[in-house]
Structures are given as structure tokens and as C-alpha cells.
Amino acid sequence: MEQMRPEHPLGMLCRVLGVSVSGFHASRSRGPSRRAQEEPRLEIEIRAAHQRTRQTYGPERLQRDLIAHGVRVGVHRIKRLRRKLGLRCKQRRKFKATTDSRHSLPVAENLLDQRFEAEAPSQSWLSDITYVPTDEGWLYVVGHKDLCTRKIVGYAMGKRMTKHLVMESLLRAVEVTRPPAGLLHHSDKGSQYCSHEYRRMLEGLGMKASMSGTGNCFDNAPMESFWATLKTELIFHRHFATRQQAIREITEYIEVFYNRQRLQKQLDYLSPAAFERRYYEQRLAA
């Protein structure tokens, strides 16, 4: 209304906009509303949260992060201020799978059968392999993910995609979690997982092997989802001069951000570590 006053009579503007002249003058004397006065501070808080969460959170998860830092604000307001500030999440891209199931090794039955829920930690693990480009060539990354906590419990990286790399990731997961016998281990039908050495290792640890159907990425969807998240939030936005640089940054992403800080909707907006901690606290209290 202030912008149109030089060109139009005040009385006419008030009639068109449905306000009284006295009401207009009263609003001017009151000054900016408390809500309007909050905007600059909220913009700073939202921008800080966007950076703190590595530009990966949408409005709902951003709201949870802000609440955790003592800032209460509605989702719709966050959406509006994000648009105003030009803040956007990192975007996903498509990437190719690494599985080569063209071999004559024995294959396990699909025991998991897309039942992506687990009642307790160390009940079901998922595993898969992906690759990361560096100036030195490909870096292959193996991961093991707990289906209950969504935590990456084991991982290993190297310049070759071998059964030994997969075995190293499994050993790390076992050393960290000490799972009970009977754990369900699900993977694709890649030759690394079907190798005699790896199958023997699973048997020695008392784990039951389960494998996806041929060419069906949905059979291992939570693990595929982690790779997509890693690539969207880190890999696609970085240039790695060496494999060692990539190893350092991927390790930091998994250990510091993904496992301990990154909120997940399916975990009641907790991080994997916080969800796991809550599980054991509730179990002790029961």
C-alpha cells in the first residue's frame, strides 16, 4: 500500500483494499509486527541449520534440527524462508550398479524377501558395493548396514572390487557390534558375496546368507538408498584428487555425519546412533 500511495489517493486505496483510513494510520504507528521482527533472526537460524546439516535436509527434518537447537518455527514458514533465501537441498542423480552375477558359484535363497523391518539391532544386515571416481581411478566402497538402526556398522574401501574387501567390511562390522548367532546377512548375487571364502566366513560367524533376485535392486533397497544418499550429499559435490582423499572424506561422512548426526524420518527423526541408544535404554527400563 505504501508503494502505491504516491500514485493514488489514500481514501481510494483503503476502499479497494477493504481497510479504514484510521486503521491504516494505526498500523503505521504500531510499526512492524512481532512476527515480522522475528524474520531476520529466523533467516540467520535457517541458513545456519542448512549449512550445519550439509545442505541435505528438507523442511521437516530442518524443523527438527532447529528445535534441537532451541528454535521453534513451523514447517510452512521454513519453506517460505528457504525459498526467499534461495536454499535448496542437494539433488540426486542416477548411478550404475556394480553387481556382476555372471558366475557359476552357489547362490543363497532370498530369505529377506523385501521385509525391511527388524525388531532389534544385529538381527539383519544388508551389504553392497559401490564405486567412487578419483583422479587415480575408481575407489570401491563396501558397506554393511543394520536394518533396525539404519547404522553403517561396517565398511571398507580399496582400489579393487574383491572378495577380500567385502570380508574386511564384514570383519569390521563384527568387531564393532559383536552380533549374536543367527543374524540374517543379505546381499546381491555378486561373485564377491558368492565366493567360497565369504560363504565360509558367514557360516563360521553363525550368520544366515540371503541374496537378492537377479537384477532386482529393490530386494536390497535400504542399502541402495544409502549409496544414493552418500553420492547425493557428498560424492557428486566433491572432486577427489586421490583415493586417500576420498577415503578420508567418506569415513568422516559415515562416522561423524550419517551415523551420529543425520536425522532419519523412519527412525522418528533420530540419528542411527541415537535410535540405537534409545532402543537399549528402553530395553533396560522395561
Segments and roles (model prediction):
Residues M1-A286:
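Charged DNA-binding/catalytic regions of mobile-element recombinases
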